[in-house]
Amino acid sequence: MPAVSLTTHAENDLLDAWMHIAQDNPDTADKLVDQLLAAANTLAEHPEQGRARPELQAGLRSWPTRTPYLIFYLPQLHGIIVIRFLHHARD
């Protein structure tokens, strides 16, 4: 089974998103994190489906989720390393 590893930045991105949304709706915050992690697990099974982002880093790829967040990741032999979860409105 393909593995998903999260960098410290990616873990902090999830926590920041959860804390921001949980102020108003903890259930929605939980669902967002679940959706992002589910998308990362899908990417681990098919890591080449994301868009190549060589202008940012060699080997880096991005994937738009069904949420307002993009996943930036590096494909690995047996999965992916998630570098960041970034809101689409963020530079």
Where are the language model's segments positioned?
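Short, low-complexity, polar/charged sequence segments that are solvent-exposed and flexible
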Residues: 23-26, 62, 83, 91
